[in-house]
């Protein structure tokens, strides 16, 4: 009952239903567009290697330019940036589809359109997480709901990575990959525009005495670069898991290894969702950095457990148990970003988190792909993923480390001691 009351409290925050529902609809493209783009380009060229280049250009362009969009949003507000990118991104995808009708000769244009599409992907995650920080600020009267709100955001966001590929598969089944790409463009346009025109984004106002980013922006904020190391460790592990689990399934499946891999990854996601919902109703720890370090250490240990699982059933049980640490860790990650980054740099800070997560995930997947090709590679790849998270845990665990000091400073600013 208490748990339900807390989540109902989040739902009743003005503008919250819009963020929760249309925020997920607008971000379905994160799970749809890369796969649909890969399939479209492969159909044109007949080669997955060329299609993968288009996907890489799309991802790198988005990772490189999203912090710029975040900085602009911090200065003028998120609504104008979201509206502009909500239109520009679908137009770039349509341009890519038109170019794909011209065959191999249009490959440079396809690559260009992929880059533009990636660069213009709406910074919706950053805007939404920044909005939750504003809605549950220390002076809002809802500060006690911040942990629950960010846990709900983190847990619901995982739907994107489950539902997105399923929607692409459905479009391909009834039509083709081009229809899937159009579908991704439509949900991005509708969801982002709706959020941008909602009362939360339109009601954005600059915070008094806020510090706008200059130069390296939040990268110069004490504690934030160290937090990005933790983000990178998680990204490497998640990217690696996307390669390791299918490789494990291929080694152990008696039937279709692709279906088995999908089930195992889905089970991992279910474990994360359960953990996230449970964590959202817990009282926030007085020392979030220490709690973050403990969760990262626990997650790192689960990869060592995965490495010794003898069969898919055992791995599935381990995944659902180990997955329970993921959403809580990501919730604390988002909470610490909101605490450490100045309000005038919040959107940019969250876009840096997304950028580092995407880049490190790609790196983790690439390294894991090399490792699993060797004898006993699946086991070593799991250990590699766990080691990446362990590095982040070590950084967060430093008692007088940069993250801990930054959190202490933020807590003192939120709750000043009367003189």
Indicate where each model-derived feature is located.
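C-terminal ends and interior cores of transmembrane alpha-helices
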Residues: 87-104, 298-310
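Intracellular juxtamembrane helix-capping segments at the cytosolic ends
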Residues: 122-138, 245, 328-341
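C-terminal transmembrane helical hairpin of 12-TM major facilitator-type secondary transporters
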Residues: 289-333
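A late C-terminal transmembrane helix in Major Facilitator Superfamily
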Residues: 344-375
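Cytoplasmic helix-loop-helix junction between adjacent transmembrane helices
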Residues: 113-157
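A membrane-interface helix-boundary motif in multi-pass transporters
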Residues: 106-107, 172-186, 255-259, 370-389
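Helix-to-loop junctions at the C-terminal end of transmembrane segments
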Residues: 64-78, 172, 274-288, 372-373
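Helix-loop boundary and gating motifs at the non-cytosolic
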Residues: 2-63, 214-265
């Amino acid at each position: 009952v208490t748990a339900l009351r807390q989540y109902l409290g989040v739902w009743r925050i003005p503008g919250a239903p819009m963020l929760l529902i249309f925020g997920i609809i607008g971000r379905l493209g994160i799970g749809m567009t890369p796969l649909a783009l890969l399939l479209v380009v492969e159909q044109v060229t007949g080669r997955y290697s060329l299609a993968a280049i288009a996907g890489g250009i799309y991802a790198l362009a988005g990772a490189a330019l999203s912090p710029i969009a975040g900085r602009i949003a911090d200065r003028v507000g998120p609504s104008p940036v979201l509206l502009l990118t909500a239109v520009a991104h679908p137009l770039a995808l349509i341009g890519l589809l038109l170019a794909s009708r011209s065959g191999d000769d249009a490959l440079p244009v396809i690559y260009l359109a992929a880059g533009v599409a990636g660069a213009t992907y709406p910074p919706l995650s950053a805007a939404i997480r920044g909005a939750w920080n504003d809605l549950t600020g220390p002076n809002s009267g809802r500060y006690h709901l911040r942990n629950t709100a960010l846990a709900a955001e983190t847990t619901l966001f995982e739907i994107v990575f489950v539902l997105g590929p399923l929607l692409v598969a459905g479009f391909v089944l009834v039509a083709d990959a081009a229809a899937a790409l159009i579908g991704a463009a439509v949900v991005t346009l509708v969801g982002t525009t709706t959020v941008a025109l909602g009362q939360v984004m339109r009601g954005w106002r600059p915070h008094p005495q806020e510090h706008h980013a200059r130069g390296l922006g939040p990268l110069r904020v004490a504690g934030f670069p160290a937090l990005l190391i933790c983000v990178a460790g998680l990204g490497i592990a998640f990217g690696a898991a996307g390669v390791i689990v299918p490789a494990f399934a291929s080694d152990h499946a008696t039937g279709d290894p692709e279906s088995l891999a999908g089930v195992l990854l889905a089970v991992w996601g279910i474990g994360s969702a359960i953990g996230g919902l449970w964590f959202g109703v817990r009282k926030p720890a007085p020392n979030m950095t220490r709690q973050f370090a403990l969760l990262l250490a626990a997650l790192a240990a689960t990869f060592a457990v995965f490495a010794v699982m003898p069969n898919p059933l055992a791995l599935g049980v381990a995944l659902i148990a180990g997955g329970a640490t993921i959403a809580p860790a990501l919730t604390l990650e988002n909470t610490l970003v909101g605490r450490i980054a100045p309000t005038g740099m919040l959107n940019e800070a969250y876009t840096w988190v997304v950028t580092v997560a995407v880049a490190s995930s790609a790196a983790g997947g690439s390294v894991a792909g090399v490792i699993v090709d060797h004898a006993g590679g699946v086991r070593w790849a799991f250990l590699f993923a766990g080691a990446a998270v362990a590095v982040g845990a070590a950084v967060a665990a430093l008692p007088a480390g940069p993250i801990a000091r930054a959190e202490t400073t933020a807590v003192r600013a939120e709750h000043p001691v009367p003189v």
